[in-house]
């Protein structure tokens, strides 16, 4: 069975084809980073228009990469939310229309479930149950996962997501959009503990996060010190260390609370090398395992949507004839299969 996956939730157009026997057959991705760079962030209207231009050519490229024709596709999966409503509608409309034209099932996929299941694309996929840390520009959540669709929210950010805090702090440091990865690169040149940032909400029980205060702390630190490149690198190091430590502390608590031995990290920030190293060290000491996708599957992509669509289709899920998207869509509302 082959599923075509379409991802258009924000500023990346992704199309992939997944075969339940042969694995990933094609993976095409177009990033809109250059389009939005001049504006310092994603402009929803521009994102939607670019998805209109790029989605169909990427579908054609994916079919060519896989050596397939339209009649070889058994289902079409598309991201139905959460995300930017206009961007979601582009992928959903194209995906639902293709499914209707090809007379195959359509599957509306939850974007964050796609991220959560992305490590399943690797050679050593995690087994259930596990704790999942979903960490991206729009979400920071700890989820107890006991099966597909069996998701219990353990904690989440009460304000900025971790990725959003990275991007905002990077902007304060004068870095271009998207600043998160650039901040991490700058942090590698920073002196450890020259500056020490707080670890928000780690001095109280619970698994919720708060990162907006770190941005304010960074702004004050930048204001009160010289603007040399070394000082900026030291501030970047202090900021990244604070975020990574906070995430690790909360993950440890979630594992203690659940009793699980496996940890999955997913979402764009899961590509951060410092975070990966910190959690790998923590899990080794605990005698557990940590799982994550390769970097290209951490950010938005069609492969995770195709895979999640395959899993949902096998579980009996398919979309209605109408096109419906959900810009806000709690993960816990998904049915278990």
From Swiss-Prot:
Give the cofactor binding note: Binds 1 Fe(2+) ion per subunit.
Q: Where in the cell is it found?
A: Cytoplasm
Mainly resides where? cytoplasm
Recall the GO molecular function terms of this protein's record.
iron ion binding; N(6)-L-threonylcarbamoyladenine synthase activity
Reactions catalysed, semicolon-separated, are: L-threonylcarbamoyladenylate + adenosine(37) in tRNA = N(6)-L-threonylcarbamoyladenosine(37) in tRNA + AMP + H(+)
Give binding positions for substrate: 134-138, 167, 180, 272
- Cited Pfam families: TsaD
Record-annotated residues binding Fe cation? Answer: 111, 115, 300
Q: Offer a single GO CC term for the protein.
A: cytoplasm
* Enzyme Commission no: 2.3.1.234
> InterPro entries recorded for this chain?
ATPase_NBD, Gcp-like_dom, KAE1/TsaD, Peptidase_M22_CS, TsaD
What keywords sit in the KW lines?
A: Acyltransferase, Cytoplasm, Iron, Metal-binding, Transferase, tRNA processing
Chain's role: Required for the formation of a threonylcarbamoyl group on adenosine at position 37 (t(6)A37) in tRNAs that read codons beginning with adenine. Is involved in the transfer of the threonylcarbamoyl moiety of threonylcarbamoyl-AMP (TC-AMP) to the N6 group of A37, together with TsaE and TsaB. TsaD likely plays a direct catalytic role in this reaction.
**NCBIfam families xrefs:** gcp_kae1, T6A_TsaD_YgjD
The name under which this protein is listed is: tRNA N6-adenosine threonylcarbamoyltransferase
Q: Which organism is it from?
A: Erwinia tasmaniensis (strain DSM 17950 / CFBP 7177 / CIP 109463 / NCPPB 4357 / Et1/99)
